[in-house]
UniProtKB/Swiss-Prot annotation:
Location of the PFL domain: 26-694
Lineage, broadest ranks: Bacteria, Pseudomonadati, Thermodesulfobacteriota, Desulfovibrionia, Desulfovibrionales
Protein name: (2S)-3-sulfopropanediol sulfolyase
Pfam families referenced in this protein's UniProt entry, alphabetically: Gly_radical (PF01228), PFL-like (PF02901)
Keyword annotations of the record: Lyase, Organic radical
GO biological process: alkanesulfonate catabolic process
Binding site for (2S)-3-sulfopropanediol: 183, 187, 462, 464, 672
Role: Involved in the degradation of the organosulfur compound 2(S)-dihydroxypropanesulfonate (DHPS). Catalyzes the radical-mediated C-S bond cleavage of DHPS to form sulfite and hydroxyacetone. Can also catalyze isethionate desulfonation, but with much lower efficiency.
Active site: 462 (cysteine radical intermediate), 464 (proton acceptor)
Chemical reaction(s) catalysed: (2S)-3-sulfopropanediol = hydroxyacetone + sulfite + H(+)
Assigned GO CC terms: cytosol
Organism: Bilophila wadsworthia (strain 3_1_6)
Alphabetical list of InterPro entries matching this protein: Form_AcTrfase_GR_CS (IPR019777), Gly_radical (IPR001150), GRE (IPR051215), PFL_dom (IPR004184)
């Protein structure tokens, strides 16, 4: 085991100097011990029964077909109750599992499925009989019908050329990467509170009343609204049928058990499942079970980017918690145990990416169902309550990768709550991530969201926010590798990785640029060319998706969908906010490279462009002095106005183009800096860059500094983020910011106060997102050498935490190479 002078609590647990307290958690640890670190398996039932129904309903409105398919799945798929569990509702076999969505990527099955058990990243087992059913029954139906095939067919050649690396579109080019062919929707947050307060019988009655009020002489009412409302009625039946089947299973299991304690647990489970989600929840246990049914049935409905988030759990569960505590029918420990039963079942659902690109972008069995706590009420008051603290306690006491815990921070966040956040950060497992109300709320309001709803946002995905009854944009986004713009500028429109293929603009021989202004204008031309191709790609994506996807459950829980009688996947829903976005990949890599060229070539003339090109073409072998000069040029992340001003201008003209696309496409387009793990594969196709980075090395992630380039401490990193933002522009959104700290610098009471201070500074600067890794480099290196001794090591990756040993060596090295700040 690693021997470090100061360990985080997580590291102490790993080394045995601090024991894991299982007392009071015997139930959840029994479940966890059975499934943790097992290789997940593929469950085909969702795909099988969904396909069976879709085969029978061709020609009907897609939303209606989808609802009928969900009902078929609800009636036929096997239901399970995990031994020792207090909650019912899973969508696959016992153990860790993933499910399939052939409507998205069934055309990949023949090429990809056979390799699932042996692939390097996130392998899955599959039963041979299931494989046969998949290939003989399921895949043939979807041939020629999948969304991916349609998109690949209609993309113009010049857009395909930056999107896919092969004719079939199986592999991304990693230049302008669409994400819509491996997910049917972006991350989503259902309106759980509506289901809890009203129940699906009442929601269904609303649809029936609307149906009865239609004008059946009106063509729109007959052909669009009528089948939509019929779909809403059917999907309400579907989720209630599914719940009732769990109730019956619980009764049958109770009858067969000899353990009197377990028998009573199962009988109570049966009673709860017969009541919710059909009727309003009456207590905390019913509210939690209702939430879990909605969350898991949402997974049957669609592949929402691995993320059906939990929403503001401390808000919508609190009335039930408070009532039960006051009446003496629930203790805080019982509430915690019930929630941890949810966490441990959540950990068993593993998002399965058949698409090779999706698997590259979501390493480490990534999925992140964020629990949002803290923040403000719709009236603008501090929203912290007893449950907010309980979620933080659970994360410290029962450390797991699931759920992702996200805390909303504002200028009036209580010191006591901030202290508990600091203690959780100190633990070292990367939780919680922080989202800043002072940036998010006014920005969403300016973009058109009513202020009370902007104040009530939930965190969804890595750093995204959702307003469950106002958001209507579900389409996939695009990841743009702007380091390719830099390389194409230095290589006349070409990338070394792809040989002589012309991918960008032919901007000429870079040695002929006489001034920085000429060079920078040529860079902007390459950059904007990528943006324009990305916007064209996404325009096509947005037009195709309503032909392939529907979401009746999400729609019936969405006020605007019910008001307008439109499916959530409709192209435009009146009253909704459409926040489209694209991801900026390689921000600090580009900025540092531009700063080095400007400083060393054009201003100080210490290097010629030819010398820089020769050094890069040799991957700096034999040119180490030049590499050091480039590395020592001004770098983003150090509160250096030289680099930060370039960063701000790059962000500025990128937002200008986003605003133009917003006008052209009739939706709001934002620039975001959230890579997940895509900066690793994106970096593999990029040759050496002018900031001294070697070929194939990962790009800088999010809005963080380049690895090893931030020398002036975390406050300087925050200030660079602040100075590089264009606060006067509104085509901006989330910026993912990783900061890695040594455990020693944040140890003890003083360390907690330091964390509180840096969070307050971050909040005052109105930055969007912040998350910490607090782990010794020696621990990470030891885990690479001896993974079996470090199976429980959790680290922060992008907007999620994952087990370090579940990652590829490339991603592990990316985390190791992040700058570790030893002082605050």
């Amino acid at each position: 085991m690693s021997q470090c002078c100061c360990l985080s609590p997580q590291e102490e647990r790993l080394q045995g100097t601090k024991k894991v307290n299982r007392q009071g958690r015997e139930r959840v640890y029994k479940i966890l011990d059975r499934i943790q670190f097992t290789v997940p398996h593929v469950d085909i039932e969702r795909a099988r029964y969904f396909t069976e129904s879709m085969r029978q309903t061709e020609g009907e409105l897609l939303t209606l077909r989808w609802a009928k398919a969900l009902k078929n799945v609800a009636e036929k798929m096997t239901v399970y109750i995990t031994p020792d569990q207090l909650l019912a509702g899973r969508v696959g076999q016992l153990g860790r599992y993933g499910i399939l969505y052939p409507e998205i990527d069934g055309d990949f099955y023949i090429e990809v499925m056979k390799d699932l058990p042996n692939r390097e990243k996130s392998p899955f087992q599959i039963d041979p009989t299931d494989m046969q059913i998949l290939m003989e029954e399921i895949a043939p139906y979807w041939e020629g019908k999948t969304y991916h095939e349609h998109l690949n067919k209609v993309l113009p050649a010049e857009i395909r050329g930056v999107t896919y690396h092969d004719e079939r579109g199986l592999k991304s080019k990693f230049v302008v990467s669409e994400t819509s062919s491996y997910r049917s929707a972006l991350q989503w947050v259902p309106d759980y509170e509506k289901a809890m307060k009203r129940g699906f019988i009442d929601i269904q009655n609303e649809a029936k009343a609307k149906l009865a009020g239609l004008d059946l002489t009106n063509s729109v009412d007959i052909w669009e609204k009528k089948p939509f409302l019929e779909a809403m009625i059917i999907v309400c039946d579907a989720i209630m049928i599914w719940a009732k089947r769990h109730a019956q299973l619980a009764r049958d299991t109770a009858a067969a058990t000899s353990d009197p304690v377990r028998k009573q647990e199962l009988l109570r489970m049966a009673d709860i499942c017969e009541h919710v989600p059909a009727y309003p929840a009456r207590n905390f246990r019913e509210a939690v079970q209702c939430q879990w049914f909605v969350q898991m049935f949402s997974r049957i409905e669609q592949k929402a980017s691995a993320i059906i988030s939990n929403g503001r759990m401390d808000q919508y569960l609190y009335p039930y918690y408070k009532k039960d505590i006051e009446e003496g029918t629930l203790t805080s420990e019982e509430a915690k145990e019930l929630l941890e039963c949810m966490w441990v079942d959540m950990a068993q659902f593993i998002d399965l990416y058949i698409n090779p690109t999706g698997n590259e972008f979501q390493e480490g069995y990534a999925h992140w169902e964020a629990v949002t706590v803290g923040g403000q009420t719709p009236e603008g008051e501090d929203a912290t309550n007893e449950l907010s603290y309980l979620f933080l306690e659970s994360k410290r006491e029962f450390p797991m990768t699931y759920p992702d815990l996200a805390v909303r921070i504002h200028s009036r966040t209580p010191d006591r709550f901030l202290y508990e956040i600091a203690l959780t950060v100190q633990d070292g497992s990367g939780f919680p991530k922080l989202i800043n109300d002072e940036e998010v709320v006014p920005l969403n309001a300016i973009k058109g969201c009513p202020i009370n709803e902007a104040l009530d946002y939930a965190i969804s995905g890595c750093t995204e926010t959702r307003m469950p009854n106002r958001d209507t944009y579900t389409s996939g986004c695009v990841y743009i590798n702007f380091a390719t713009a830099l390389e194409m500028l230095m290589n006349n429109g070409r990338l070394h990785y792809y040989g002589d293929e012309l991918i960008g603009l032919e901007t000429g021989d870079p040695t002929r640029f006489q001034t920085w202004e000429e060079f920078y204008e040529a860079y902007k031309a390459q950059h904007i060319n990528l943006l324009q191709k990305a916007f064209q790609q996404q325009h096509i994506v947005d037009r195709l998706r309503p032909q392939h996807f529907a979401a009746p459950l999400s729609s019936v829980l969405h006020n605007l969908c019910m008001k307008n009688m439109q499916d959530l996947h409709s192209e435009k829903i009146e009253g909704g906010v459409d926040y489209s976005y694209f991801e900026f990949l390689g921000y600090a890599t580009v900025v540092d490279s531009l700063a080095a060229i400007k400083k060393l070539v054009f201003e100080e003339k210490r290097l010629t462009m030819r010398e820089v090109l020769d050094a890069m073409n040799a991957n700096f072998v034999g040119y180490e002095p030049i590499q050091e000069m480039l590395k020592n040029a001004p770098c983003y992340g150090n509160n250096d106005p030289y680099a930060d001003s370039i960063a701000k201008d790059v962000d500025r003209f990128t937002q200008v183009e986003a605003e133009k696309s917003s006008r052209d496409r009739g939706i709001h387009v934002d620039v975001r800096y959230v890579p997940i793990t895509s900066h690793v594969p994106f970096g593999k196709i990029i040759a050496a860059t002018p900031n001294g980075r070697v070929a194939g090395f990962p790009l800088a992630d999010g809005s963080s500094a380049s690895h090893g380039a931030d020398h002036n401490g975390p406050t300087a990193v925050l200030l660079s983020n602040y100075h590089s933002k264009n606060y006067g522009m509104i085509n901006r959104a989330s910026r993912l910011l990783n900061i890695k700290l040594s455990p020693k610098c944040v140890a003890g009471e003083q360390g907690a106060k330091k964390i509180m201070s840096i969070i307050r500074t971050w909040c005052d600067l109105k930055l969007w997102h912040l998350q910490f890794n607090i782990v010794n480099r020696d621990t990470l290196l030891a885990a690479q050498k001896d993974p079996n001794s470090y199976r429980n090591l959790i680290v922060r990756v992008a907007g999620y935490s994952a087990y370090f040993c579940d990652m590829s060596p490339d991603l592990q090295n990316d985390i190791i190479d992040r700058t570790e700040h030893a002082d605050l």
